[in-house]
Regions:
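Extracytoplasmic/lumenal domain signature
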Residues: 43-57, 83-103, 116, 129-161, ...
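Bacterial N-terminal signal peptides that target proteins for export
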Residues: 1-9
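Extracytoplasmic electron-transfer domains, predominantly the class I c-type cytochrome c fold
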Residues: 165, 247, 454-457, 461-535, ...
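N-terminal pre-domain segments of enzymes
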Residues: 17-39, 353-388, 392, 537-546, ...
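Mature N-terminal segment immediately following signal peptide/propeptide cleavage
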Residues: 17-59, 66-69, 92, 570-573
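Repeat-blade elements of multi-bladed beta-propeller folds
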Residues: 22-26, 62-80, 104-129, 162-186, ...
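N-terminal signal peptide c-region/cleavage motif recognized by signal peptidases
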Residues: 11-13
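Periplasmic c-type cytochrome electron-transfer domains
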Residues: 28, 371, 378-396, 403-408, ...
Length: 696
């Protein structure tokens, strides 16, 4: 078995004098994305200049990486999931690790652990987690098997038939690496067990079943023996760790299949749940389920943030969790008691045969939502009279009733905010000095529906069963998040398409359940449109009676959102009071701004950081490719610059040799086809002794 290749460019002392670091994804185990550095502040941020760049030299991917910085060394990931160590002051490459496994999907960061002279970087590549020597980049052979563990194992199912990848880094508690994983949106999918591995040996130390086994709490909220066949309820968004209390906070997503739950009737604990687990043992301490029996893909999409707030005159250690719907939930960290009341409200039942939507869902009474949650005709675009009229006519054909309206068979339903939030994977930042939580949000409407599956086995039916859940019946996708497959036969060879189906690519999982004949029929349908019937064959698996018809953005004929602005926002919420300090549109379409239509806000992917220097740094905006610095108290824009590609990631800040840097990974991972894409780390600092690392 190949462990992987590494390239050592220069040795470096990890035992050097202590620096002010960014030691973990989210800035630290609490995930506050806060730095106490003050060299760059409100008075001088306008003087920021590029200090160095590191160009990975790779093409478009969507890594979404926030680097970590330890003792003057920056550790990051390339679009193809190679791991790099850079001199954090110059951008000079120190070493590079190549697992030899192809990958282009999200890889949001790395995990660092040290004990004495043993210093390790844990890096995820597809279904594997590698332990690397932080000084050399070499895989550590006594971790797992030849330097890696396989996340498809230890799930109680045949590993060969599982698709699970680690897209967001886990956390380290003492000598345990605690991880979740991303699973497919539809069955078959593995269970979303939360697992802890020994950081030295790679042995599994504990596992928490998010789909409970017989005798475990929550088992009765699923059909009998669902643990053997149901899937997902997984943690893909990240975690937060209270090191003092020894509690890890784990938000989970929906159960598979996402949109039709006839085979998982019940509340489905612990899907869509914020879990507080004993980090040493995996035992449940408390939990809160945000969506019961989710049939809308309303995962908890962001890592929790551990905060301390003033509540009823007392300091309370709390955990804040943002949602796709635009809510912020706030709980006492130790007990799970909500700091603001939560009301259970009634919602309509599903009309789809076999489905049974939950009768009530929990909603916080404060803070108010940071995204709009119901669409009416008065809220449609006025960009042009023609766009408004088109949107109005289209809207009349849609079902729109606010949150938790079940999808129907045939007529499309509005989901607002859309499938990408509200909040997303970039997370939020918390300022302990002010009690303000900073969260960026998408504010677009999407639509979709269900359709009845047809009997038989053919290339098109295999597509509808396995692929249409994302790409839609007509293969249009929802660019830039989900690419169109129309005409893909002219862009990819059949061999390439076969490899993608087998191995996965980007957000797309692999499909190990499909037989060779199924894959061949599917590939032929994608490449040529030929709907090859598999005579005498049954489908590779029994499909559910109804399937999701795909993710459809509600856009006007010119490709702009069909709702009125703002289409993206940046929000500052006082968690002491539950009130908003400020809210601003976030992002622009350059072509609309040139026509005088400014401050519309846009889709944004990536999160903020906040500093003691009085600043909020954030890139994230899809179309203007800007990196911004805002006054954290007022929301006033103090500085911005245009990146080589959209910064669809979360920045980091650190100090080396007395100099503060702010770094962002520019990839264009969420950009539209034809827009720049690649992988460039860009570090900024105040003028003086700047250098250019160049392409490595």
């Amino acid at each position: 078995m190949r462990i992987g290749a590494f390239t050592a460019i220069a040795a470096f002392p990890l035992w050097a004098a202590a620096q002010t670091d960014w030691p973990a994804y989210g800035g630290g185990p609490a995930g506050t994305r806060y730095s106490n550095l003050t060299q760059i502040d409100r008075t001088n941020v306008s003087r920021l200049r590029v200090a160095w760049t590191y160009d990975t030299g790779e093409g478009r991917g969507d890594p979404q990486t926030q680097p970590i910085v330890i003792n003057g060394v920056l550790f990051g990931v390339t679009p193809s999931h190679k791991v790099v160590a850079l001199d954090a002051a110059t951008g000079k490459l120190l070493w590079k690790f190549d697992s030899g496994i192809a990958g282009r999907g999200p890889d949001r960061g790395l995990v660092y652990w040290a004990s004495g002279g043993d210093r390790r970087i844990f890096a995820a590549v597809q279904s594997f987690v590698y332990a690397l020597d932080a000084a050399t980049g070499k895989a550590i052979p006594d971790f797992g098997r030849e330097g890696r563990i396989d996340l498809r194992e230890d799930l109680g199912r045949d590993p060969a038939g599982q698709s699970i990848v680690l897209t967001t880094p886990g956390v380290v508690y003492r000598d345990l690496l605690i991880v979740g994983g991303r699973t497919p949106e539809a069955l078959p999918a593995p269970p979303g067990d939360i697992r802890a591995y020994d950081v030295r040996s790679g042995k599994l130390r504990w596992s928490f079943h998010t789909i409970p086994h017989p005798g475990e709490f929550g088992y009765e909220t699923w059909p009998k023996d669902a643990w053997q066949s149901s899937g997902a309820a997984n943690n893909w968004a990240g975690m937060a760790l209270d090191e003092k209390r020894g509690i890890v906070y784990v938000p989970t997503g929906s159960a598979a299949s996402d949109f039709y739950g006839a085979d998982r009737l019940g509340d489905d604990l612990f899907a869509n749940t914020l879990l507080a687990l004993n980090a040493a043992t995996g035992e449940r301490i408390w939990h809160f389920q945000g969506v019961k029996h989710d049939i809308w893909d309303r995962d908890f999409p962001s890592p929790p943030v551990l905060v301390t707030v003033r509540h009823d005159g007392h300091a309370v250690d709390a955990v804040a969790q943002t949602t796709k719907q635009g809510w912020v939930y706030l709980f006492d960290r130790a007990t799970g008691k909500p700091l603001f009341p939560i009301e259970y409200r009634s919602y309509p039942r599903s009309e789809v045969p076999g489905e049974a939507a939950a009768g009530t869902q929990p909603l916080p009474t404060k803070p108010a939502p940071f995204a709009r949650q119901s669409l009416t005709g008065e809220m449609l675009t006025n960009r042009t009279p023609e766009a408004h009229q088109w949107a109005l006519e289209r809207f009349r054909d849609l079902r729109s009733g606010g949150q938790f309206v079940p999808f129907s068979a045939g007529r499309e339903t509005v989901i607002f905010p859309g499938f990408d939030g509200g909040a997303e994977w970039g997370g939020s930042a918390f300022d302990p000095a002010t009690g303000l939580l900073y969260v960026n949000a998408n504010d677009l409407a999407w639509t979709s529906s269900l359709a009845e599956n047809q009997a038989g086995a053919s290339g098109r039916q295999i597509y509808l069963t396995n692929c249409a859940v994302c790409h839609g019946d007509g293969m249009a996708g929802a660019p830039p998040q989900i690419p169109s497959l129309a005409g893909i036969g002219s862009r990819r060879t059949r061999a390439e398409l076969t490899a993608i189906v087998r191995q996965g690519a980007g957000r797309m999982p692999s499909f190990p359940n499909l037989r060779a004949r199924d894959v061949a029929a599917l590939v032929e349908f994608l490449a040529s449109g030929e709907n090859k019937e598999l005579a005498g064959e049954e489908p590779a698996r029994v499909a559910p009676r109804y399937r999701f018809t795909g993710y459809h953005k509600f856009l006007d004929p010119n490709g702009y959102p069909a709702v009125a602005p703002p289409w993206g926002t940046l929000n500052a919420i006082n968690l002491n009071t539950g009130e908003y300090a400020w809210k601003i549109p976030f992002g622009e379409y350059p072509e609309l701004a040139a026509q005088g239509m400014k401050d519309t806000g846009t889709e944004n992917y990536g999160g903020p950081i906040v500093t003691a220097g009085g600043l909020v740094f954030i890139a994230a905006t899809n179309f203007d490719r800007k990196f911004h610095a805002f006054d954290k108290r007022s929301g006033k824009l103090l500085w911005e610059t245009t990146l080589p590609m959209a910064g669809n990631a979360t920045p980091a800040t650190y100090q080396v040799n007395g100099k503060q840097y702010v770094v962002i990974y520019a990839t264009g991972g969420k950009a539209l086809p034809g827009e720049p894409g690649g992988g460039v780390y860009v570090a900024f600092a105040l003028p003086g002794n700047a250098s250019i690392g160049g392409r490595r």
